[in-house]
Each structure stands twice: as structure tokens, then as C-alpha cells.
């Protein structure tokens, strides 16, 4: 795919007054007929992370806790709130422990790699 840089008409008049020139990028699609199917990008492909993974993001734990809350009855007792926050605290503590161990390992490798 060829890339061509062109000055737009708006930016041509503005570039005479300023020191920076603004460029717009245009692509020619002449090579699109010879594309291999390997290079074609599919927008329907999604990457999924299993929920049991220890490296899942905090947003997934929040969405999981909300889905648990929706499955429960509409009555919000103090024990369910306590249970929810204690499970979130345990999960966060486990993530912090894993992250701390990883950082310690990287620091150790950095120190011993220099000698």
C-alpha cells in the first residue's frame, strides 16, 4: 500500500504564517487486489480472556461482582455487601502479592545482570 503525503489547501495558507506544516496522509488502494488473505483484518475477531486467569483486569472483577449482585435477590442485606467487599479485597490482595513478587524478581535480575 503506497502512502502519499500531501499538503491540504487549508494548511498551505496556515503554513506560511507558522513554522510547522501540517500534512494529511492519503492511501492508494491499487495493491488491494493483490492482497493475501493473511493480511486482511477481520473486525469480528475478538480476544477473550478467561475469567479464572490471575492476570485479569480490575474492570472484569467489577463486572463479575455486578453480575453476581444481579443474580442475587433484590434485597441488599449487609452480609451480602460485606461478602462482596471481602472477596474484592482478597482478590486485590492476591493481585498485589503477585505484582510485588514480579517486581522483586525483575529487580533481582537487573542487579545480577550487570555483574
Curated annotation (Swiss-Prot):
<dbReference type="InterPro" id="IPR052692">
    <property type="entry name" value="DVL_RTFL_polypeptides"/>
</dbReference>
<feature type="compositionally biased region" description="Low complexity">
    <location>
        <begin position="13"/>
        <end position="65"/>
    </location>
</feature>
<feature type="transmembrane region" description="Helical">
    <location>
        <begin position="44"/>
        <end position="63"/>
    </location>
</feature>
<comment type="similarity">
    <text>Belongs to the DVL/RTFL small polypeptides family.</text>
</comment>
<keyword id="KW-0812">Transmembrane</keyword>
<protein>
    <recommendedName>
        <fullName>Small polypeptide DEVIL 13</fullName>
    </recommendedName>
</protein>
<dbReference type="GO" id="GO:0005886">
    <property type="term" value="C:plasma membrane"/>
</dbReference>
<feature type="compositionally biased region" description="Basic and acidic residues">
    <location>
        <begin position="1"/>
        <end position="12"/>
    </location>
</feature>
<keyword id="KW-1133">Transmembrane helix</keyword>
<feature type="region of interest" description="Required for DVL/RTFL small polypeptide activity">
    <location>
        <begin position="80"/>
        <end position="111"/>
    </location>
</feature>
<dbReference type="GO" id="GO:0008285">
    <property type="term" value="P:negative regulation of cell population proliferation"/>
</dbReference>
<keyword id="KW-0217">Developmental protein</keyword>
<dbReference type="InterPro" id="IPR012552">
    <property type="entry name" value="DVL"/>
</dbReference>
<dbReference type="Pfam" id="PF08137">
    <property type="entry name" value="DVL"/>
</dbReference>
<dbReference type="GO" id="GO:0048367">
    <property type="term" value="P:shoot system development"/>
</dbReference>
<keyword id="KW-0472">Membrane</keyword>
<keyword id="KW-1003">Cell membrane</keyword>
<comment type="function">
    <text>Small polypeptide acting as a regulatory molecule which coordinates cellular responses required for differentiation, growth and development, probably by restricting polar cell proliferation in lateral organs and coordinating socket cell recruitment and differentiation at trichome sites.</text>
</comment>
<feature type="region of interest" description="Disordered">
    <location>
        <begin position="1"/>
        <end position="89"/>
    </location>
</feature>
